[in-house]
Regions:
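Short amphipathic alpha-helix that is part of the acyltransferase structural core
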Residues: 26-28, 32-75, 81-91, 96, ...
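Conserved beta-strand-loop-alpha-helix junction that forms the acyl-donor binding cleft
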Residues: 165-175, 222-225
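Conserved GNAT acetyl-CoA-binding A-motif
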Residues: 155-167
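Conserved acyl-donor/pantetheine-binding loop and adjacent beta-alpha core of acyl/acetyltransferases
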Residues: 95-131
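A short, internal acetyl-CoA/4′-phosphopantetheine-binding micro-motif in the GNAT/acyltransferase core
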Residues: 119, 129-139, 168
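Conserved active-site alpha-helix within GNAT-family acetyltransferase domains
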Residues: 169-187
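Conserved acetyl-CoA-binding loop-helix of GNAT-fold acetyltransferases
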Residues: 134, 140-153, 180
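Intrinsically disordered, low-complexity, positively biased terminal segments
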Residues: 27-35, 186-258
Length: 258
């Protein structure tokens, strides 16, 4: 799961971005099979609000720790639906089993690019991968990666150049899924209710977002639970790019960008 942000009325995507999104609409609905189960990915509209809210509640109720995922109320979700192609869902039969939300924060204070000190012009071309959630019975099907990749394609088609999202350090599985989609950890700061969050960034228009290893620096692995150590690495110009497991502990591997 990934989540971030507080709703802002201003900063909806520009008309040319909406025009770009329409180019991808004919790709959905899209049918596929996972582990012998037939599924369909499609854009959701506001009539799916109650199903989405119910799935969100179920997901939150099964979390080992409440701070892993910040849920959104129905008023917030209703406003999200007002922007076309902002919500993708995966259905198994008629049952919603996963969803992804994107949002366009404009240059407001809740734009995650502010946490990365991006220029104002870049903030205007930045979108949030706001949230991804998967039904507990459908975890391990690769749906989080599938949804992230699909919504990234929507944003690329719409002309957005910068994408950000947040992930809890206590959620290494979601972190690994997003890193595999080209995101990189650029910050680690307290966000909602003081909960620690990685700020992940991806440049959509780049051919590759993989950090290049500087000749004088080696890869450094550090426990996801080591907040201070990771913040110090980030301060020194390192980016997190890969998750590994040592025994029962998850490590995030950092490399310094050239």
């Amino acid at each position: 799961m990934a989540e971030n942000g507080v709703w802002k009325e201003k900063g909806h995507c520009r008309q040319e971005h909406l025009t770009g999104q329409k180019k991808i609409a004919n790709l959905y609905p899209r049918s596929f099979v996972r582990r012998g189960k037939s599924m369909e990915m499609r854009f959701l509209v506001e009539s799916s609000l109650s199903d989405l809210a119910a799935l969100q509640s179920l997901v939150v109720s099964t979390l080992p720790e409440v701070e892993i995922f910040m849920p959104h109320d129905e008023e917030y979700l209703s406003r999200i639906f007002q922007t076309e192609h902002s919500v993708l869902g995966v259905l198994a039969g008629e049952k919603l089993v996963a969803y992804s939300i994107i949002r366009y924060p404009g240059t407001g204070k809740d734009n995650l690019g502010q946490d990365l000190n991006l220029a104002e012009e870049d903030l205007k071309n930045l979108a949030h991968l706001q949230a991804i959630a998967v039904h507990p019975h459908f975890r391990g099907y690769g749906l989080q990666r599938e949804l992230a990749a699909a919504h990234l394609q929507v944003l690329e088609s719409s002309g957005y150049e910068h994408i950000c999202c947040t992930v809890s350090p206590k959620n290494p599985v979601s972190l690994n899924n997003l890193l595999s989609c080209g995101f990189r950890v650029r910050a680690l700061i307290p966000k909602f209710a003081g909960w620690w969050r990685y700020i992940l960034y991806k440049g959509v228009s780049r051919s590759s977002d993989r950090p290049k290893k500087a000749e004088s620096e080696d890869e450094i692995g550090i426990a996801c639970s080591n907040i201070d150590g990771q913040r110090e690495l980030i301060r020194k110009g390192y980016e997190g790019y890969s998750v590994g497991k040592t025994g029962e502990n998850f490590d995030l591997f950092y490399r310094k960008m050239e």
